[in-house]
């Protein structure tokens, strides 16, 4: 009898301990949000009180990097934990180069650890040739856009929910009707003339419903916003919002009013998620991370310098300078993260894989380019051991590597002249030191050659040096 009592007490004590090691994880990903677009990262014109409060109660990562400088490859790095030299999707392509079933993702790892998983919003990891791609690679629930071009349209005629087409009440202009066949590679793109259902509003409601439904057991919510991206098909009227609100009275260009409203909506919706976690009394067992997929855009009539969206950094979306890849990142976890702090070590999207695996008590996939920053969340100092690496296949191609305080950029890949910057003293990358530091240039080139793995789907002009 005594043995049974001891065994019973052991089981009772052990189960809650295990549950406590599996926090809920919410990853909020803004689309084309620049480092300087939030008040807590230096924004002066636009107010972001909820995100500023989130940073004050949590912590900021001041040197956090996106996976790439455009959406599809950046999201591929995020999902696979592999950097741009080895991930599946390395560019924005209309071809069906996608993560396939059987390939490990952030979602599949967490699902295997007992998490309920959801992707709500913009999937856009390549151009899937089916409607079930997110579900096929680990998400129990999906609601949103499958391809990136569809995600340009804030008032789409349809969305996808778990492999099924969901018709909406919106209607695009006649010139875009040919793109409303869901089976087309760029299906759903266009500009609406009948605007009744704003997709970002549908996504936040679905996200809140998912949290409520799964509050009793571990969940992973990947809330992939499609703002403040522009509707590129809309020309200079691409910053589409239902209501300009307070910005309607501003003496600003119309696209900038729309951009301001989008930032306000991002702030509001993030606050709604945090409020719900508190209401459900699960905030202390939930890690929320807010970040962006790349640097600020200059599309839809919006100008990146109007709000100084890249902050103190040079470059924007489609550049491998800091402004194109360094992104505003906030972590919030009441009771675990000590409020008001910041971490200045450099991390990147691929590190979510190792970090989430550790939090879930799961084994991280083999062969990933990922290091855990969980110690940082617990207030401990930790630095990344390995270099960071990027490739980009537009604008003639480019590659970049960060090793310690140094960052090198080569454009075009393989054959271009190397630029070298000391980010500790020159974060704006204004002074190229390549001519003064030949040994560091040699080291950078060696890293670039080592970290690039050839892929027949992704080719550049010029030959790789041997």
Task: Indicate residue ranges for each PLM-predicted region.
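Formylglycine-dependent sulfatase
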Residues: 2, 8, 18-419, 423-466
């Amino acid at each position: 009898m005594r043995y049974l009592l001891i065994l019973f007490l052991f089981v009772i004590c052990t189960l809650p301990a295990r549950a406590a090691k599996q926090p809920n994880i919410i990853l909020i990903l803004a689309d084309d949000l620049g480092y300087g677009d939030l008040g807590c990262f230096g924004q002066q014109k636009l107010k972001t009180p909820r995100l500023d409060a989130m940073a004050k109660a949590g912590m900021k990562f001041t040197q956090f990097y996106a996976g790439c400088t455009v959406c599809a490859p950046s999201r591929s790095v995020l999902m696979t934990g592999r950097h741009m030299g080895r991930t599946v999707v390395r560019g924005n392509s209309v071809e069906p180069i996608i993560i396939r079933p059987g390939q490990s993702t952030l979602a599949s790892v967490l699902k295997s650890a007992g998490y309920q998983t959801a992707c709500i919003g913009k999937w856009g990891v390549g151009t899937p040739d089916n409607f079930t791609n997110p579900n096929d690679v680990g998400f129990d629930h999906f609601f949103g856009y499958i391809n990136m071009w569809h995600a340009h349209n804030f008032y789409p005629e349809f969305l996808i929910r778990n492999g099924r087409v969901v018709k909406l009440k919106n209607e695009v202009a006649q010139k875009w009707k040919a793109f409303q066949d869901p089976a087309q590679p760029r299906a759903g793109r266009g500009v609406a003339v009948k605007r009744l259902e704003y997709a970002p509003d549908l996504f936040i409601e679905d996200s809140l419903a998912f949290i409520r439904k799964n509050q009793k057991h571990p969940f992973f919510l990947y809330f992939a916003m499609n703002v403040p991206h522009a509707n590129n098909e809309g020309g200079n009227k691409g910053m589409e919002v239902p209501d300009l609100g307070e910005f309607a009275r501003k003496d600003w260009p119309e696209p900038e009013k729309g951009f301001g409203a989008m930032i306000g909506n991002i702030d509001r919706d993030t606050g709604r998620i945090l409020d719900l976690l508190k209401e459900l009394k699960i905030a202390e067992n939930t890690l929320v991370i807010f970040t962006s997929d790349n640097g600020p855009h200059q599309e839809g009539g919006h100008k990146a310098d109007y709000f100084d969206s890249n902050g103190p950094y040079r470059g924007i979306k489609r550049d491998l300078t800091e402004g194109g890849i360094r992104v505003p990142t906030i972590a919030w976890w009441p009771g675990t993260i000590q409020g008001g702090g910041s971490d200045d070590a450099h991390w990147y999207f691929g590190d979510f894989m190792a970090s989430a695996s550790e939090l879930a008590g799961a084994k991280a996939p083999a062969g990933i380019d990922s290091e855990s920053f969980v110690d940082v969340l617990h207030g401990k100092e930790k630095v990344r051991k390995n270099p960071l690496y990027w490739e980009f296949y537009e604008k003639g191609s480019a590659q970049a590597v960060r090793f310690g305080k140094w960052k090198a950029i080569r454009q075009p890949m393989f054959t271009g002249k190397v630029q070298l910057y000391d980010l500790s003293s020159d974060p704006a990358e204004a002074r190229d030191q390549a001519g003064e530091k030949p040994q560091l240039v040699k080291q950078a080139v060696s890293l670039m050659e080592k970290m690039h793995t050839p892929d027949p789907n992704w080719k550049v002009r010029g030959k790789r040096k041997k």
